[in-house]
């Protein structure tokens, strides 16, 4: 649907638009005083796209379950394929990621009580100013809840923007892969971010001055107010605010890697926040003239860390235009309780710490933001599968430990209730055949299952399952056997591999999937089927794999940095995995 003109209200009255991934459900071209209310859109790359509209109102629209990409990180280790980059959007590069709502050059209006869950991105603003964004639910997306690019004077208050995350596996890795509940990028200034729930994201708030500032040293994402938000349980940072000047006050930051990461921040106020059970409460490198005052630091490993490195990246323009010494901090009136280290400072001058601490108090600072039972859980509630974050609204089986463990322990996740086993294949034993949600089910695959097994459960009439399809490939390299070709590590040097494997597949349709960086070739029965020998960043390639007995050969050569190589056989034809 395309909408053009002024003073238009389109009330969908709950009607649903059902589309395909390449499409946009509703497009608004220019105009003023345009209202879209009670629309439902499913299956689109973009739900609502507006350009150049003045005084736009989007109210009570449900734009959930639209496009999102498959993820390739595993329980045991991540994949670099899944890392995001939002650094450039001058030519609508962000549209490649899709969005429930994408607003470009929109001036004024309100975005109220909309929902966008289980997609990749919720709301993206590009050069869009003066918007009031209130009472929305942009949660459980695999990229961003809300993203701003060159967007200023917007007010984002009283929203639920939780669990926008990827790149996390509890007990194995905590990377985030540049996902975030709220992203503020590239000269986005004078925004008010207040009273929001921003929990369990890659970051809670991810603010970066932008490439313009990095190159020229000018501008920044400055004078934003981040006040009374819950930025807890992020995989990385509750608030990341870099190369800019901002005010961060009265927020709750519990259980993050970093409560506030403020690299190269200047004249920034960090006041009245509650930092509890973080690895670092506040960490700032190369910052200057910052204030850290009236905060509570409780059970953080390191409460405050300030430092400067002797060498800065040579390709950054920013240090050539700014004094980037770590200097001139005012640290006063903070409460420190049971922190391993209170203040760690290195290569830092001008520290005013005479009044750094107040008498200890266990009472948290005043705080007001929306909460839900899920927003109060710790990071163990973050479960990310190949389609993004799990929302706890439906039943799910998920490994408690490594997927290689035998027996394999599976957590039965979901709302309260009971479950029962309705079918099983390729399994020797199950620890139980019925129980309650929250149980752990131990599965021992049969020795003759050849890596092909599944257990299916039922909860209130809904079936859900967990299984494995991993045909045994007898790999050898340098006359040594390999259990699988799955390598992921960082090591300087020039590592290489040549491995040969044999496999037998029963009748059916199969696909070879290779995930690689650097340089890789894959041969099937001595025929080159995937040629990725030109040095490249991590990517995914597919090739058709016939049934029967076959020989595979993979060649890999590291050119720099990270090593990522994974070769696997999956069910189905390649086109099933390469659709947009």
Segments (PLM) and residue ranges:
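Acidic/polar low-complexity surface segments
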Residues: 20-29, 47, 57-104, 110-113, ...
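Short beta-strand/loop motifs in extracellular/secreted proteins, especially
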Residues: 8, 34, 56, 109, ...
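Long, low-hydrophobicity ectodomains and other hydrophilic envelope-associated domains
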Residues: 375-480
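Short, well-structured beta-strand segments within conserved domains
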Residues: 10, 34-35, 159, 191, ...
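A generic structural motif
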Residues: 31, 53, 106, 128, ...
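Beta-solenoid repeat scaffold
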Residues: 1-16, 30-33
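Extracellular/secretory pathway-exposed regions associated with glycan biology
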Residues: 444, 454-511, 515-580
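Extracellular beta-strand-rich, repetitive "passenger/adhesive" scaffolds
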Residues: 12-15, 39, 61
């Amino acid at each position: 649907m395309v909408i053009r003109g002024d003073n238009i209200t389109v009330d969908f009255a709950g009607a649903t638009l059902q589309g395909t991934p390449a499409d946009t459900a509703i497009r608004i071209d220019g105009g003023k005083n345009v209202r879209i209310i009670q629309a439902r859109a499913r299956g689109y790359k973009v739900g609502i796209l507006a350009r150049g509209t003045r005084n736009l109102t989007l109210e009570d629209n449900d734009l959930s379950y639209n496009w999102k990409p498959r993820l390739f990180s595993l329980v045991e280790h991540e994949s670099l394929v899944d890392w995001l980059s939002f650094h450039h959007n001058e030519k609508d590069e962000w549209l490649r990621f899709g969005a429930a709502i994408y607003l470009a050059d929109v001036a004024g209006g309100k975005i109220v009580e909309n929902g966008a869950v289980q997609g990749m991105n919720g709301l993206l603003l590009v050069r869009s100013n003066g918007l009031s964004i209130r009472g929305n639910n942009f949660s459980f997306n695999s990229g961003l809840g809300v993203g701003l690019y060159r967007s200023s004077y917007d007010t984002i208050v009283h929203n639920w923007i939780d669990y926008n995350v990827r790149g996390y596996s509890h007990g194995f890795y905590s990377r985030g892969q540049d996902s975030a509940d709220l992203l503020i990028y590239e000269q986005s200034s004078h925004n008010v971010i207040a009273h929001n729930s921003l929990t369990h994201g890659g970051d809670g708030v991810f603010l970066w001055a932008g490439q313009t500032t990095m190159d020229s040293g000018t501008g920044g994402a400055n004078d934003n107010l981040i006040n009374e938000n819950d930025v807890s349980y992020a995989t990385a940072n509750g608030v990341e605010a870099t190369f800019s000047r901002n005010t961060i006050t009265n927020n709750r930051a519990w259980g993050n890697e970093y409560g506030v990461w403020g690299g190269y921040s200047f004249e920034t106020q960090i006041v009245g926040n509650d930092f509890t059970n973080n690895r670092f409460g506040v960490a700032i490198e190369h910052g200057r003239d910052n204030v850290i005052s009236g905060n509570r630091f409780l059970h953080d490993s390191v409460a405050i860390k300030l430092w400067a490195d002797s060498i800065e990246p040579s390709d950054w323009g920013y240090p050539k235009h700014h004094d980037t010494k770590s200097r001139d901090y005012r640290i006063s009136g903070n409460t420190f309780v049971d922190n391993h280290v209170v203040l760690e400072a290195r290569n830092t001058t001008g520290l005013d710490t005479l009044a750094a601490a107040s008498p200890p108090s266990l009472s948290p600072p005043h705080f007001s933001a929306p909460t839900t039972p899920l927003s109060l859980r710790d990071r163990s509630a973050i479960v990310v599968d190949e389609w993004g974050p799990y929302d706890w609204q439906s039943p799910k089986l998920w490994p408690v430990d490594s997927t290689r463990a035998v027996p394999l322990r599976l957590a039965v996740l979901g709302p309260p209730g009971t479950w029962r086993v309705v079918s099983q294949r390729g399994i020797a034993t199950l620890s139980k055949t019925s129980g309650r949600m929250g149980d752990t089910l131990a599965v021992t695959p049969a020795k003759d299952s050849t890596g092909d097994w599944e257990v299916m459960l039922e909860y209130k009439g809904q079936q859900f399952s967990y299984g494995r399809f991993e045909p045994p490939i007898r790999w050898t390299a340098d006359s040594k056997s390999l259990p699988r070709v799955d390598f992921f590590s960082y090591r300087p040097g020039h590592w290489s591999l040549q491995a040969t494997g044999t496999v037998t597949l029963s009748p059916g349709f199969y696909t070879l999937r290779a995930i690689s960086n650097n340089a890789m070739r894959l041969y099937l029965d001595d025929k080159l089927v995937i040629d990725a020998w030109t040095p490249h960043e991590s990517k995914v390639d597919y090739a058709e794999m016939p049934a029967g007995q076959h020989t595979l050969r993979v060649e890999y050569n590291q050119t720099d940095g990270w090593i990522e190589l994974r070769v696997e056989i999956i069910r189905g034809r390649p086109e099933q995995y390469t659709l947009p």
